[in-house]
């Protein structure tokens, strides 16, 4: 399974979302549609999930990560993660999103967050001084 995700940081905190009926928070993004690049998928998902417009030039690759897919047996998730350097609009949860949160080191342990972001992405953002 191939997904892309976006790193959006504001005031030293990372944006994470929780879908309706789910317990785990994740960074905005989602599965690639057929013939879509990871960058195109992320631009589409950001508009669908939080109503912001992003161009391909606004994205910088942060890294590619692999982990067992959440709630799927014998499925590996490949996730391309991008910095979202700029966007147009305001972050507003769509009807498929139950909750948006801005997390940093002071509150990240209070929520369930996706494995790749908890184990790989978030610690690197803290180490690089991008997230408090």
Task: List PLM regions with ranges.
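N-terminal strand-loop-strand
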Residues: 1-27
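Active-site-adjacent beta-strand/loop module that shapes the phosphate/pyrophosphate-binding cleft
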Residues: 2, 65-90
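Conserved hydrophobic/aromatic beta-strand scaffold that supports enzyme active sites
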Residues: 16, 81-83, 102
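A short, polar/proline- and glycine-enriched secondary-structure boundary/capping micro-motif
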Residues: 25-29, 103-105
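The catalytic Nudix box helix
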Residues: 28-62
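NUDIX/MutT-family hydrolases
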Residues: 92-124
């Amino acid at each position: 399974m191939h997904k892309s995700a976006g790193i959006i940081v504001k005031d030293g905190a990372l944006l994470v979302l929780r879908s309706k009926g789910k317990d785990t928070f994740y960074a905005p993004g989602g599965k690639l549609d057929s013939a879509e690049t990871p960058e195109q998928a992320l631009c589409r998902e950001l508009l669908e999930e939080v109503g912001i417009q992003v161009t391909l030039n606004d994205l910088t690759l942060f890294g590619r990560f692999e982990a067992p897919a959440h709630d799927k047996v014998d499925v590996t998730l490949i996730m391309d993660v991008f910095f979202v350097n700029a966007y147009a609009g305001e972050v507003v949860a769509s009807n498929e999103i139950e909750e948006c949160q801005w997390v940093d080191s002071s509150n990240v342990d209070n929520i369930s967050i996706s494995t790749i972001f908890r184990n790989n992405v978030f610690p690197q953002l803290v180490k690089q001084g991008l997230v408090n």
